[in-house]
């Protein structure tokens, strides 16, 4: 990745050129990376290699004038060997307590994820040798080891799973096969002989490890859930009858062979359950020290045969013995201290200092060494799993992005100790807060292009947008209020990328004036409800946009639309409706137009018009419904159901437990269900209590229902911008919760153990 940053990790950019987006059939935003075009790449950059990912302009560049800064990215061609990477954009506003600096700019922090560089899809000789070997014998392993080859073991990272799934999809597409299960479970070995070697490209793992992973992913019987007492009894009977014929036992129980094998391994007829007695603890300690030739008080975490320990203890299984010793008894005997919140923050910082690309590369033994409050390396890793679940979609972000988010979260909690203790109540403001920060995360993942279209590389973007109130340094006690907006609908939203700004209170409670560094003002209404949908209403002038929170009832039952546009020197992103696109991929295309200037709009227009799109894309027109008035303001809604994508959110450990108790409720009259996940959690963005003098950082989208699909503008039905009135002040408290569904419950201990056992194979 190329930037012009010098001593800092932060660079300041202005709009350089336009970028083209589309949307695929799965609802992903697609960033098209144009080839070397003299119109899109400056002459001084033309000599640069064509394999850059992003090109950013520096604030110090002499070509940048004093215009209001805007966000822009010029995408240059991606090479065929390029892999997915992560970009974290952080919009930072530094303002005085009572005024906004004219020099305030929008900054972008780039976080490069190079962890896939070592596992290129083309593969080096080393990777190819490993990923093409089954390792069926010890001689195979020894042979490659003696040649200096190394390979990954243990848990699979998210990036590895992404590579595996992408390889499988390419294999199916090339052979016209719709379902991978046809190959895995129905074809003979001869028919699928090249399958596993093909999908293993780019993975530094033996073929047998890939084979086991694929079986677990596609065998539905492997995800049935926890064994019931009845199944345990049935399993015991089948084990006596069939011995180690795991396939037969699994078929009888409706579970996979690997699942029943692992469950039998952990099962013991004579096991006690519940609280350990003092006699059991004493016997466990004696057996462990005897088998490891250690003294009482010594720390023992490795080299223990738990099967042998369980046999000597007699009343507990090997799983119970291992858990009791590593999570409590050894720590108690060695005089350990209690784990504190400071230890949790210290763990995050220590992991960040390791600078590893994947958590599977962490040496937990080394990390736990000399740490008195750590009960064992295994316990420390379990503690890390608990910590990272504070990020709701921790499974969907890369490890560097996850670490960065956790560091920011705990830094905020350190500066604001009452943040999570009183989300809706009152409290004292933070005197250390002198700036407002908003994080906008963009995840860029490489996609395979359609063979029917010219082979240009592309990348998919997912943009969680979060809104957080940040109180002033001298403000009195106030309540914390935050909302999270997620973007991913049937048609793309029209929204404006704004420079940095702050929020000025108005005379109406809950309504603020969004003041940028220019003269533009954007009144904004926010409610205390943690789940809101922001909708654009009629502007009072060409310089303003009204944003109002609507309740889900109105979103579902009306079809009124309105689209507004600020004709100011900003970057406007617009879209077209799906039905208007003549693309074989059924994609939608939109452009970031960076060439808008005030001179382009000498007079306020009488009607709103769409930006110019490429010739091959129909030009949708944007109109304001004539029925727009005070009575209909609460009826603005999406014409089509919207699927909200997951955003990076913060959850406390208590909320994680509470979330597990919630049940998913299907919406009654949606063709496509709203999907939200634990939106009541505080966001990852910096938050403190809010008062009338609060400052806020946000990027405002308009929901996709505000995109008018019609190609014809009825000029008689379009009201002049200056004649529309502000209707929202009477309705600013009409928001209510969207139907939510809880996050998946934390993995049970049984399933975790099964996963650990499999990873050892």
From Swiss-Prot:
What does the UniProt entry report for the null mutant?
Answer: Mice spontaneously develop tumors with a mean latency around 80 weeks. The most common tumor types are pulmonary adenomas, adenocarcinomas, hepatocellular tumors, B-cell lymphomas and vascular tumors. The protein appears to be haplo-insufficient for tumor suppression, as heterozygous animals are also prone to spontaneous tumor development. Mice lacking this protein also exhibit enhanced susceptibility to tumor induction by activated Ras or the application of dimethylbenzanthracene (DMBA) or ionizing radiation.
Give positions of region: Disordered.
Answer: 24-51, 584-625, 740-761
Q: Which InterPro entries match?
A: DMTF1_DNA-bind_reg, DMTF1_N, Homeodomain-like_sf, Myb_dom, SANT/Myb
Q: Which SMART domains match?
A: SANT (SM00717)
Q: Which GO terms describe its biological process?
A: positive regulation of transcription by RNA polymerase II
Annotated region Required for DNA-binding: the residues are 87-458
Compositional bias segments (type: Acidic residues): 37-47
* Required for transcriptional activation as annotated region, ranges: 87-170, 459-761
Q: Where is this region: Interaction with CCND1, CCND2 and CCND3?
A: 176-761
Q: Which GO terms describe its cellular component?
A: nucleus
Describe what happens upon changing residue 319 to E: Abrogates DNA-binding
Cite the PROSITE patterns for this sequence.
Answer: HTH_MYB, MYB_LIKE
Q: Where is the Myb-like domain?
A: 225-263, 339-388
**What induces or represses its expression, per the UniProt entry?**
Expression is induced by activation of the Ras-Raf signaling pathway, and this may require JUN and JUNB. Expression can be repressed by E2F1, E2F2, E2F3 and E2F4. Expression is also repressed by non-classical inhibitors of NF-kappa-B signaling such as doxorubicin, daunorubicin and UVC, and by the NF-kappa-B p65 subunit (RELA).
Molecular-function annotations in GO: DNA-binding transcription activator activity, RNA polymerase II-specific; RNA polymerase II cis-regulatory region sequence-specific DNA binding
Its tissue distribution reads: Ubiquitously expressed (at mRNA level). Expressed in brain, intestine, kidney, lung, pancreas, skin, spleen and tongue (at protein level). Expressed at high levels in testis and thymus (at protein level). In all tissues examined, expression is predominant in non-proliferating and differentiated cell types. These include epithelial, interstitial and smooth muscle cells of the intestine, differentiated spermatids, sperm and interstitial cells of the testis, and lymphoid cells of the medullary compartment of the thymus.
Q: Which UniProt keywords apply?
A: Activator, Cell cycle, DNA-binding, Nucleus, Phosphoprotein, Repeat, Transcription, Transcription regulation, Tumor suppressor
Per the record, which residues fall in region Interaction with CCND2?
A: 1-237
Instruction: Give the main localization category.
Output: nucleus
What subcellular compartments does it reside in? Nucleus
Q: Which family does it belong to?
A: Belongs to the DMTF1 family.
Its quaternary structure?
Interacts with the D-type cyclins CCND1, CCND2 and CCND3. Interaction with D-type cyclins may modulate transcriptional activation by this protein.
Q: Which PANTHER family match?
A: CYCLIN-D-BINDING MYB-LIKE TRANSCRIPTION FACTOR 1
Q: What is this protein called?
A: Cyclin-D-binding Myb-like transcription factor 1
This protein's species is Mus musculus
């Amino acid at each position: 990745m190329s930037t012009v940053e010098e001593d800092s990790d932060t660079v300041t950019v202005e709009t350089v050129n336009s970028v083209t987006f589309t949307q695929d059939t799965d609802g992903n935003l697609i960033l098209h990376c144009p080839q070397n075009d003299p119109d899109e790449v400056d002459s001084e950059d033309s000599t640069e290699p064509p394999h850059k990912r992003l090109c950013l302009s520096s604030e110090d560049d002499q070509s940048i004038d004093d215009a209001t800064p805007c966000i822009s990215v010029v995408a240059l061609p991606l090479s065929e060997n390029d892999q997915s990477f992560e970009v974290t954009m952080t919009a930072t506003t530094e303002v005085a307590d009572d005024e906004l600096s004219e020099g305030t700019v929008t900054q972008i922090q780039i976080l490069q994820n190079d962890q896939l560089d070592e596992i290129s899809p083309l593969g080096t000789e080393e990777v190819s040798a490993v990923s093409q070997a089954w390792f069926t014998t010890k001689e195979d392993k020894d042979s490659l080891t003696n040649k200096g080859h190394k390979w990954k073991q243990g848990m699979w990272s998210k990036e590895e799973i992404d590579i595996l799934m992408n390889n499988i999809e390419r294999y199916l597409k090339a052979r016209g096969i719709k379902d991978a299960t046809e190959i895995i479970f129905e074809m003979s070995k001869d028919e699928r002989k090249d399958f596993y070697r093909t999908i293993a490209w780019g993975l530094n793992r033996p073929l047998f490890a890939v084979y086991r992973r694929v079986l677990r992913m596609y065998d539905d019987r492997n995800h049935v859930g926890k064994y019931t007492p009845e199944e345990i009894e049935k399993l015991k009977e089948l084990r006596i009858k069939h011995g180690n014929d795991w396939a037969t036992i699994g078929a009888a129980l409706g579970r996979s062979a690997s699942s029943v094998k692992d469950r039998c391994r952990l099962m013991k007829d004579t096991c006690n359950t519940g609280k350990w007695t003092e006699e059991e603890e004493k016997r466990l300690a004696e057996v462990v020290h005897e088998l490891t030739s250690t003294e009482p008080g010594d720390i023992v975490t490795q080299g223990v045969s738990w099967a042998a320990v369980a046999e000597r203890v007699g009343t507990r299984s090997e799983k119970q013995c291992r858990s009791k010793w590593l999570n409590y008894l050894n720590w108690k005997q060695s005089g350990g201290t209690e784990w504190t919140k400071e230890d949790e923050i210290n763990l995050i910082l220590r992991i960040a200092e390791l600078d590893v690309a994947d958590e599977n590369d962490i040496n937990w033994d080394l990390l736990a060494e000399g740490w008195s409050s750590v009960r064992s390396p295994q316990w420390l890793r379990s503690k890390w799993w608990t910590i990272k679940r504070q990020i709701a979609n921790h499974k969907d972000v890369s490890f560097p992005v996850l670490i960065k988010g956790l560091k920011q979260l705990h830094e905020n909690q350190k500066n604001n100790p009452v943040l999570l203790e009183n989300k809706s109540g009152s409290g004292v403001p933070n005197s250390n807060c002198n700036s407002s920060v908003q994080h906008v995360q963009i995840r860029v993942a490489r996609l395979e292009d359609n063979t029917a279209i010219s082979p240009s590389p592309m990348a998919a973007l997912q943009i969680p947008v979060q809104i957080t109130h940040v109180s002033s340094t001298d403000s009195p006690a106030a309540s914390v209020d935050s909302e999270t907006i997620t973007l991913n609908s049937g048609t793309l939203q029209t929204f404006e990328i704004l420079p940095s700004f702050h929020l000025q209170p108005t005379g109406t409670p809950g309504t603020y004036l969004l003041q940028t560094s220019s003269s533009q003002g954007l009144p904004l209404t926010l409610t205390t409800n943690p789940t809101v949908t922001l909708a654009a209403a009629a502007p009072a002038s060409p310089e303003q946009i009204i944003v109002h929170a609507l309740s889900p009832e109105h979103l579902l039952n009306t079809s009124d639309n309105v689209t507004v546009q600020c004709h100011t020197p900003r970057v406007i992103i617009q879209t077209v409706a799906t039905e208007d696109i003549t693309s074989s991929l059924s994609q939608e295309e939109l452009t970031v137009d960076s060439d808008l200037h005030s001179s382009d709009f000498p007079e306020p227009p009488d009607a709103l018009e769409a930006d110019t799109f490429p010739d091959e894309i129909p030009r949708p027109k944007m109109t304001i419904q004539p029925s727009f008035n005070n009575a209909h303001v609460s009826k603005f809604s999406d014409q089509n159901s919207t699927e909200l994508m997951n955003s990076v959110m913060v959850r406390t450990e208590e909320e994680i437990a509470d979330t597990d108790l919630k049940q998913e409720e299907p919406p009654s009259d949606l063709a496509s269900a709203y999907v939200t996940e634990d939106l009541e959690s505080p966001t990852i963005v910096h938050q403190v209590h809010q008062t009338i003098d609060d400052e806020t950082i946000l990027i405002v989208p308009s929901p996709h229902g505000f995109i008018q699909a019609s190609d014809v503008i009825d000029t008689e039905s379009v009201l002049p911008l200056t004649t529309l009135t502000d209707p929202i002040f009477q309705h600013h408290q009409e928001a209510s919760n969207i139907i939510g569904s809880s996050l998946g419950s934390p993995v049970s201990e049984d399933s975790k153990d099964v996963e650990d056992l499999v990873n050892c194979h």
